[in-house]
Every structure is written in structure tokens, then in C-alpha cells.
């Protein structure tokens, strides 16, 4: 029995899909445990590019089980569209399983998300307006509709009528916008439910059975630890728990069954949306990193904010998520820079801070303290071992490991599967 959790150590978009795809080769099952279609994974296989939002990266291995766990919130319309897109490209999706306990995103969640963001004025939190937050709100308020409900026509009708009565009062009285009708939702979404019904089951049992039989399970994280609702830069966070601990809740697998946690980082930092970002770059170097790294959101298409690698952030992620290994991506993006910098601490009003503050007011006033290293001009995309990297690039990788206190398991020099280079096999570690 072995299980590996993949988490993002920054604000998402670190390349988790690439690492998950790579590690999936040795897994028997691959499961997502948090988030929804607000997170995007880009995967390159045999020269083909695939962009996933809900479906686990393991879908490309027909002999392996791919699981959408109970911790996700699922938009059936988006899921059906994504499934058809894969099927049209010749990908067999019969290995997908969806938790019957996963909550369902409905049109009123999206409408509420948009209305709520607009009502914030200048204090927007940068939501993707996919209905994620409102769906999690309903889950906690115990009025959510789960997959098991969606598949039962009578129960779905009853719950939908009840919820629409509540939501329409909210739309009309509070947001002062027009409500939604039962008719424009019911048949369409019940239809989506019937299209995906064959995939819906008790996924917790499936995953635990794999582990009981001595198999390997890979848990695919979404977003990043700094977007975690508890451990991230609140309120500029998502509504779920992307930390490794989210596996126990969102996949129905006990914490004692997790054997290792691999944190994924870029060789720099990026962020979409608002919120503090101490190492953010606004100069030509930042623009170069953005363009070379193609830093535009998979889900939103928005330009990502970019900055230097921040060890304060990654050490925080290591601590709250129990990270045992690091996957360092996008080293190739830094090629051509005369100098590269690593943030080692923050300066706050003359005080050196080495732990990530909870107070956003403090973070916004923090100045990064950098360690500067010489850059490299060589093309590293063909490097397959640490020794093949230019000396300065190799020193950069080693310094990241030293400053974060995390052993590096893989380093990547490009988006393709064969450009991921293994230093430690986490399945055997």
C-alpha cells in the first residue's frame, strides 16, 4: 500500500497536472479531493495538449481508475462538456468514477457568485465566478444537492424547488436582480445527471479497496496551499482545503494511509487574482518571465502575476501540509536572466520575518529579502540529469532545496512528460 498526495506550494498553476500525469504512470488509481472547475490542469502527451478542469489527470490511462472525490463541487454541465471533448479526441473515459457524495453546482450558484463579486465594488476577491464558493456555502448550510440527489428525479425536484425559493429571495431582495425559474434548470440538469450516472458511485470504498489490496493511489491536488481557506491568504482564497490534509475529508481516505506528500513549485512564483504577493515583479524581468512561461490562466485566460521564488511561502506550505518532497518546475523559463533571486525572509518595519503572517495588513507592508544568484544563458530543455544542467542552474536548484528544507524529487525543464527528471522515486521513498 502506497499513497502519494500532490499539492501546490504556492497560489496554484505550479504545474501539478504535469507532475500528476508523470506520477500516474505507477499508480493504480488517481483521485481529486478538492475544488471544482475553477482549477485548470494543462497536460502535454505525445505532442498533444489537453486542458482539464474537473477530470483527474489519470483519465489518460485507461487501465487506471480516475476519481472525482466527495470533496469536489461538480458542475454537471461543465463535466459533460469536458467528457465529450476528451471522447471526441479518442480518449476513453470509462475509467472515471464520481463520488455520489460530491455536491452539485447549479445555475443559481454561478448567478450568486457573479452578483456577490459585483457587489464588492473595489474589494473584489478575484473569484472565477464558477459558483464554487456559493456551492460550498450551501454544503455547510446543509441545503446542498449532492450527486446522489441529482440522479433521483423526485428528490432532485423537491430539493431544487426548496433551494430556488431561498435563492430567488436572495437575488430579488438583496442583490436586486431577477431570479431563476424551476423550468429553466430542472430538465437540463437532470439530463446531465443521467448522462454521467454510470460514473457515479461510492468512491471512498473504491480508493480504500485499492489500498487494502496493496495498490498505489495518487491524490491530485488543485490550486495551491496559499489559496487554502484556512491556511492561505484569507480572504483571497478558494472555498476548500487544497492542503494535503484535505485528502482525508475530500476523498474519504484516512490520514494514516498517506505515505508521502509532494509539493509542486515553479522555479519562480505566479498568482491569478487579487491578494498580497511580496515578491511580485512589475518590471521587464517580470514581463519576460510571463511571456516565456506563458503565464495566462487555464480557466480564465487572465495574465498571471509573476515574481521571484519565495521560500517563506514554500516553508509555510511545507509545515501546514507535511510536504516530504518538492517537484521544481519551469527551470527553463529562467534561462537568459543575468541574475536570479530567491526570497529568504521579509522585512517588516525593520523586523526580519521568516514565517508567513496571518494578517494581510502586515503582508502588504512586507519587503522581500533576497539572496541573489548568477543566472544562466544556456538552453536547459534537453537536460535529463542534475549534472547536465549549467552550473548556475544546478546551484539554483540546490539552493531552493536548502532554503526550503525540502528534498527535491523531480525537476522539470519544459512542459512535456519526458522533460520531467527524477531525483527521488516518491513511490519508493
Swiss-Prot record:
<dbReference type="GO" id="GO:0044208">
    <property type="term" value="P:'de novo' AMP biosynthetic process"/>
</dbReference>
<keyword id="KW-0460">Magnesium</keyword>
<feature type="binding site">
    <location>
        <begin position="12"/>
        <end position="18"/>
    </location>
    <ligand>
        <name>GTP</name>
    </ligand>
</feature>
<keyword id="KW-0436">Ligase</keyword>
<dbReference type="InterPro" id="IPR018220">
    <property type="entry name" value="Adenylosuccin_syn_GTP-bd"/>
</dbReference>
<dbReference type="InterPro" id="IPR042111">
    <property type="entry name" value="Adenylosuccinate_synth_dom3"/>
</dbReference>
<keyword id="KW-0658">Purine biosynthesis</keyword>
<feature type="active site" description="Proton donor">
    <location>
        <position position="41"/>
    </location>
</feature>
<comment type="similarity">
    <text>Belongs to the adenylosuccinate synthetase family.</text>
</comment>
<dbReference type="InterPro" id="IPR033128">
    <property type="entry name" value="Adenylosuccin_syn_Lys_AS"/>
</dbReference>
<protein>
    <recommendedName>
        <fullName>Adenylosuccinate synthetase</fullName>
        <ecNumber>6.3.4.4</ecNumber>
    </recommendedName>
</protein>
<comment type="function">
    <text>Plays an important role in the de novo pathway of purine nucleotide biosynthesis. Catalyzes the first committed step in the biosynthesis of AMP from IMP.</text>
</comment>
<feature type="active site" description="Proton acceptor">
    <location>
        <position position="13"/>
    </location>
</feature>
<dbReference type="GO" id="GO:0005525">
    <property type="term" value="F:GTP binding"/>
</dbReference>
<feature type="binding site" description="in other chain">
    <location>
        <begin position="38"/>
        <end position="41"/>
    </location>
    <ligand>
        <name>IMP</name>
    </ligand>
</feature>
<comment type="pathway">
    <text>Purine metabolism; AMP biosynthesis via de novo pathway; AMP from IMP: step 1/2.</text>
</comment>
<dbReference type="InterPro" id="IPR042109">
    <property type="entry name" value="Adenylosuccinate_synth_dom1"/>
</dbReference>
<dbReference type="InterPro" id="IPR001114">
    <property type="entry name" value="Adenylosuccinate_synthetase"/>
</dbReference>
<feature type="binding site">
    <location>
        <position position="142"/>
    </location>
    <ligand>
        <name>IMP</name>
    </ligand>
</feature>
<feature type="binding site">
    <location>
        <begin position="298"/>
        <end position="304"/>
    </location>
    <ligand>
        <name>substrate</name>
    </ligand>
</feature>
<keyword id="KW-0547">Nucleotide-binding</keyword>
<feature type="binding site" description="in other chain">
    <location>
        <position position="128"/>
    </location>
    <ligand>
        <name>IMP</name>
    </ligand>
</feature>
<feature type="binding site">
    <location>
        <begin position="412"/>
        <end position="414"/>
    </location>
    <ligand>
        <name>GTP</name>
    </ligand>
</feature>
<keyword id="KW-0963">Cytoplasm</keyword>
<dbReference type="InterPro" id="IPR042110">
    <property type="entry name" value="Adenylosuccinate_synth_dom2"/>
</dbReference>
<feature type="binding site" description="in other chain">
    <location>
        <position position="302"/>
    </location>
    <ligand>
        <name>IMP</name>
    </ligand>
</feature>
<feature type="binding site">
    <location>
        <position position="40"/>
    </location>
    <ligand>
        <name>Mg(2+)</name>
    </ligand>
</feature>
<feature type="binding site" description="in other chain">
    <location>
        <position position="223"/>
    </location>
    <ligand>
        <name>IMP</name>
    </ligand>
</feature>
<feature type="binding site" description="in other chain">
    <location>
        <begin position="13"/>
        <end position="16"/>
    </location>
    <ligand>
        <name>IMP</name>
    </ligand>
</feature>
<dbReference type="GO" id="GO:0000287">
    <property type="term" value="F:magnesium ion binding"/>
</dbReference>
<dbReference type="GO" id="GO:0046040">
    <property type="term" value="P:IMP metabolic process"/>
</dbReference>
<keyword id="KW-0479">Metal-binding</keyword>
<feature type="binding site">
    <location>
        <begin position="330"/>
        <end position="332"/>
    </location>
    <ligand>
        <name>GTP</name>
    </ligand>
</feature>
<feature type="binding site">
    <location>
        <position position="304"/>
    </location>
    <ligand>
        <name>GTP</name>
    </ligand>
</feature>
<dbReference type="Pfam" id="PF00709">
    <property type="entry name" value="Adenylsucc_synt"/>
</dbReference>
<feature type="binding site">
    <location>
        <begin position="40"/>
        <end position="42"/>
    </location>
    <ligand>
        <name>GTP</name>
    </ligand>
</feature>
<dbReference type="InterPro" id="IPR027417">
    <property type="entry name" value="P-loop_NTPase"/>
</dbReference>
<dbReference type="GO" id="GO:0004019">
    <property type="term" value="F:adenylosuccinate synthase activity"/>
</dbReference>
<feature type="binding site">
    <location>
        <position position="13"/>
    </location>
    <ligand>
        <name>Mg(2+)</name>
    </ligand>
</feature>
<feature type="binding site" description="in other chain">
    <location>
        <position position="238"/>
    </location>
    <ligand>
        <name>IMP</name>
    </ligand>
</feature>
<keyword id="KW-0342">GTP-binding</keyword>
<comment type="subunit">
    <text>Homodimer.</text>
</comment>
